[in-house]
Amino acid sequence: MEMSNAQRLILSNQYNLMSQLDPSNAAKYKRLQTIVERGYELQMRELNKDFGCITETECREIIDIMEMYHAMQESNKMLDDEERGKVDQRRLQFLGFDIATEAQQVHYVRFLVDSEGLYPQFDKADHHFNSQMPMLDKYRRMLKTWRNCPRQYHLCANELAQIFSA
């Protein structure tokens, strides 16, 4: 993150004020203030992590992934008991993304569910959409398979299995 000296001074003052307003997090704000004041470039990258950017294309891809899971869950509900028995029910749960490598995607999913109220049927589980393993490539393969299905919102057990194994 490139900042002018004036910007660094303003941010330093804000961290100083935050440390006074929020004593329980004072050590955190003092640390960030020191990083900004002294210009530690490596640590200043930490400041960037909260100011990510997801393109419109990436946002639409995440929504498509969530919509695919919604379609799979709804399709599963429409199956008769025999067909439903062939579907691994655990794989119908949307796990989210890996917070370590796909943080922006995790935050966007949380925004969609928590702030926008979309997909309330998705179980946040204990990890709140942190799959704890990279998922984006897997989801992309699943999306490709799902998009090739003729009836995307009325999938049979075989189609669900194909999507899961993509």
From Swiss-Prot:
Transmembrane segments: none annotated. InterPro entries: UPF0304_YfbU, YfbU_alpha-helical_sf, YfbU_helix-hairpin_sf. Signal peptide: none annotated. Gene3D superfamilies: Helix hairpin bin, yfbu gene product, domain 2. Belongs to the UPF0304 family. NCBIfam families: PRK05445.1. This is UPF0304 protein VIBHAR_01542.
